Amino acid sequence: MPSAKSSDLSPTKTNLESTTKQKVSVQDIFLYIPNLIGYLRIITAIISFLCMANHPVATLIFYGISGFLDAFDGYAARKFNQGTRFGAVLDMVTDRCATSSLIVYLGVLYPQYTVFWQILVSLDLSSHYMHMYAMLSAGSTSHKNVDETQSKLLSLYYNNRLVLFFVCLINELFYMAVYLHYYKFFWLGTVMLVASTPIWLFKQIANIIQLKNASLILARMDAHDHSKRD
């Protein structure tokens, strides 16, 4: 009786890989390490909101923790290969909600500048939403994949993780400094406000540019689609 070939008796490498790979469930995605960090960011941000009216130091601590953790969710996603669409959106939504909530409270403390705060919230939300929507609609896997042909400033802002982290951090420090200034914290308030203003201005310019670029991307796609119809 002829002997069976060894290739017939042993599973192939592909079969071994397929049997060892585990199916990732929806619950697994929610429990990925970067997403757990995202939930912790949300919790600490909410605690800071609860402290804003009467406990400025506690607000600074918890809001600071929420912002500082922003540096670690992306790192964890890369280190453990746990980058997800849900995590990317959770990260951006948390950033936008935290910043907007702080600015809203600044409107309570400084009602004479209400229109100014409204414009800042509108610019922040609209520019980031339109940028993300435009990039994903254009086929990009991430809203952070910006090349120099679109904008050198945005390319530097999104592709250099150090620049992105520090610009976002100092932008948040500006709003926190305005908050602390109301409570007469001179060194933490007024001095930090003056020091952070240039980077805050840079961030607003970046928001305007990404709003403009996103509008152009969407308009070009619309023009292409309508040209094909005609």
UniProtKB/Swiss-Prot annotation:
Out of the domains of life, which is the source? Eukaryota
Q: Which residues bind a CDP-1,2-diacyl-sn-glycerol?
A: 74, 78, 84
Q: Does the keyword Lipid biosynthesis apply?
A: yes
Compartments in which it is found: Endoplasmic reticulum membrane
Active-site residue list: 95
Tell me a GO biological process for this protein: phosphatidylinositol biosynthetic process
InterPro entries xref list = CDP-OH_P_trans, CDP-OH_PTrfase_TM_dom, CDP_ALCOHOL_P_TRANSF_CS, CDP_diag_ino_3_P_euk
Membrane spanning segments where?
29-51, 58-77, 90-110, 113-133, 162-182, 185-205
GO molecular function annotation: CDP-diacylglycerol-inositol 3-phosphatidyltransferase activity; metal ion binding
The UniProt keywords, alphabetically, are:
Endoplasmic reticulum, Lipid biosynthesis, Lipid metabolism, Magnesium, Manganese, Membrane, Metal-binding, Phospholipid biosynthesis, Phospholipid metabolism, Transferase, Transmembrane, Transmembrane helix
According to the record, what happens upon gene knockout? Growth defect.
Q: Which ranges does the record list as Cytoplasmic topological domains?
A: 1-28, 78-89, 134-161, 206-230
What is the activity regulation comment for this entry? Inhibited by calcium and zinc ions. Inhibited by nucleoside triphosphates and diphosphates.
The UniProt similarity line reads: Belongs to the CDP-alcohol phosphatidyltransferase class-I family.
For this entry, the protein name equals: CDP-diacylglycerol--inositol 3-phosphatidyltransferase
